[in-house]
Amino acid sequence: MATEEGTGLTFYPMDQFIVSPLFGDGPVHFYTPTNVTLWMALAVAAIALLLVAGTRGRAVVPSRAQSIAELAYGFVYKMVEDVTGKDGIKYFPYIFTLFMFILVANFLGLIPMSFTTTSHIAVTAVLALAVFITVTVIGFVKNGAGFLSLFWVASAPLALRPILAVIEIISYFVRPVSHSIRLAGNMMAGHAVLKVFAGFAQVAAVAPIAIIGVMAIYGLEVLVSAIQAYVFTILTCVYLKDALHPHH
C-alpha cells in the first residue's frame, strides 16, 4: 500500500494480482471461472486467430498476420533445431505452443485493466511441471536406464563423481521451481513497479516525472515480456536436449 498525505492518494500495487471470480463475490474453487480463466482463454483465442488468419490464403506478398505468424514459427523452429538438434524437431509443436501462450499472455497483461496470468506462480508452475514431466518421460522412453547417465559426470575425477551426482540430481529436481519462479517473479515485479509510478502520476508535484517513468517502464515491460517468453522456451529446449542426449 502507498498513501500520499493531503492528496487523498491511495493505491495498492499488488491488488492487480488478486484472483477474483467472474460471477459474484463468492469463494474461489478449482472449478470457479476467474479473471485468470478469462485472460488465459483470451490468450488462446488470440493465438488461434493469429495462426488462422496468418495461414489462410497465404500470399506471395504476406499480410501482417501472415508475416507475424511466419516470423514466430521460423524463430521458434530455428531455436529448437539449434539447441536440440534434428532429434528435437518432432517436439516443435509443443514448444511452439508454450512460446506463443507465454508471449501472448504477457502482452495481454500490458493492456490497461487487464490481468497478467503469467504473474501467478500457480500458472507458471503448471507450465514448468508440464515441461519437467514431459522431458523426464522422453528421457526414459528414448534412453531407458541410460537417462540416469545425465547425473553421472564421467569426465570428472572418480572421487568427485558421487558428490557431483548428488548436486546434479538436486539441480534437476529444482528445475521446475526456478523455471516457474523466474517467469512469475519478473512479470509480477515489473507490473508492480509500473503500478507504483502510475499511482504517483496523480500527484501534481511529481506527475511529469511519474508519467515519464510510466512510459519508460512500459517500454521496458514490452521487452521483458518477449524476453521472458524466450527464456522459458529456450530453457525448455535445453532440458529437452538433456533428455535426448543425456551423456556428459
From Swiss-Prot:
One of its GO terms (cellular component) is plasma membrane. It is found in: Cell inner membrane. It comes from the Bacteria. Keywords: ATP synthesis, Cell inner membrane, Cell membrane, CF(0), Hydrogen ion transport, Ion transport, Membrane, Transmembrane, Transmembrane helix, Transport. One of its GO terms (molecular function) is proton-transporting ATP synthase activity, rotational mechanism. The keyword Transport applies. The chain crosses the membrane at residues 34-54, 91-111, 121-141, 147-167, 197-217, 220-240. It is a multi-pass membrane protein. The keyword Transmembrane helix applies. F-type ATPases have 2 components, CF(1) - the catalytic core - and CF(0) - the membrane proton channel. CF(1) has five subunits: alpha(3), beta(3), gamma(1), delta(1), epsilon(1). CF(0) has four main subunits: a, b, b' and c. Key component of the proton channel; it plays a direct role in the translocation of protons across the membrane. Belongs to the ATPase A chain family. This is ATP synthase subunit a. It comes from Dinoroseobacter shibae (strain DSM 16493 / NCIMB 14021 / DFL 12).
